[in-house]
Amino acid sequence: MTDSDMSLLEPTRLRELFDLRGSVYASRGGAFEDDIYPAFHRLRETGPVHPGIVGPLVGFHGAAFFQGLPFPDRPHFSVFDYATCDAVVRDGATYSSSEHPPGSEAALNEKMILNMDGTRHRRYRTLVQPSFVPKKARWWIEQWIDSTVHALIDSFERNGRADLNVEFCAAIPLLTITGSFGVSVPLALDIRAAVTKDGLGLGTFVDIVQPIIEARRLEARDDLISVLVHSEVEDEAGDVHVLSDDEILGFAFLLLAAGSGTTWKQMGITLTALLSHPDWLLAAKEDPAVLRASIEESLRWTPTDPVFARFATRDTTLGGFDVPAGSVVHACFGAANRDPSRWDRPDEFDPGRPLQAHLGFGGGPHICLGMHVARAEMQTAISALLTRLPNLRMDPDAETPRTIGMYERGPTSVPVVFG
């Protein structure tokens, strides 16, 4: 990745696609600007489970199209403590990732690994899991992350100031994941636009990715899409087949959507936390272990995806409530990660606290596939900023950043000065 490559990433469009207050995130409650954590605490204190949807329960009454929403014809339940959230995401037999009844034709025809469960989910996840294990982080860093990070810093280093939220934090995971699928820089924003149109951009997505699939079938390269193109999977009948184009497109859509849409907000959250705590910022600059701890603490303290849903496969009981089969159960990871029964001073950002498991990347069989890549992106990017930009600090003349959003949360900006 070079400076000339960066010039192909149109800045105005980049800002539009990653504006939490803009149209792209409107259906996810992007402009909801209340502090959601007092409401999370209030709800948890009166019981771990509440009938209803997280948004309205905390004061957000806008329309929302998100995983588990809207489903107006189904009962909804929301979970706010750590133990119950953890139990829900671990129990895939009772709380499914698919909206369809287990064993139904619709469930068996799911093309998205996110919506699969059980043995079928494990078979498909196993295909790409080796590319996302911790020891493969170096591959991602050397192939895409490191060059992207330094090319981006080159583009604004002489200015003495920058808004890191979009021109840095958003661009890194976008160019990393699209690069791993063989998508050129000029088309990276087209991919991002396609995967954020709630199904309306599928034609554009296929037009870009299908030719790459065909090219990799003829000649593999050292990238993620080649791994998918040449993977084989065993079906329910025990027959082995090479992944079809539709199966690859399903994988690609999920990985490109998630890979370009989550890490940037978490990186911004981590940076604003460190910039607001200068002692921790200095410690993170001097010690990579402190930076790793800071990233992990930001995932606990303010996860960018605070809510994820499951679907009850049978009549069950949860937190004292009868939950009918087909109900939507919203696991509120943001509330769970500040459960005072698990963490002392849960509202404080404290990278020095004892490390224990959190739900910043979800949990159970569907724990985030790309979590080690996300950690590598944040570690590499923030370390490079601290090394290359002397006296990095929040811009005193800019508006103070705020973390906003209902179902996807991130900072309004990360304005910095340096030098």
What spans do the regions from the language model cover?
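Cytochrome P450
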Residues: 1-419
